[in-house]
Amino acid sequence: EKLNWIDENYLSHFEKIEVDSEVRLQKPFAERKEEYGFYSVTEGEDTEGKAYFSYNTVCGDGLDRNLYRAFPVLSYVLVQSIGAPLKQALLDAGIGNDISCYYEESVRQPFFSIIAKNVKMEQKQQFINVIETELKKIVKEGLNQQSLLAAINGYEFQYREADFGNFPKGLMYGLQIFDSWLYD
């Protein structure tokens, strides 16, 4: 009854229009891009060795369900776990003192970032070289199977438990659904 009233008094006075709401994939850059930014430090604080480096790359299509579940596991094995090869290679090379990563899966084009904290600016090329060399080595030799299995088991447990901390389970499931529903 209420919907009929809304239709008769409002909606029926308008013509339906087709809206192209597709979020298109961005074309790859022809060459590597660099961005520089600054952050605040206290007055007189020495800024030597206080840079942050971030190596970022697009990871396929946000609608790829296999990638959606696999990449968090891969990022854990590569960077987040104890002795993770990418993290360890950067630390062994003396690049930064805190290595982390970030994977954003809730966008049309997911991206992966490797971040080094407290780095010297002159280590920029070394940072890139270590990451690319280590990734090529991993492609050639493969991942540590025990680390990979541990990560898979950990994520399986996390998904089965569905523990979202202080957030209601239904709300979090709804937000996860939007990761793919937002795109045509």
Name the predicted role of every residue range.
Residues E1-Y36, E43-F71, Y76-D184:
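Charge-rich, well-structured scaffold segments of protease-associated domains
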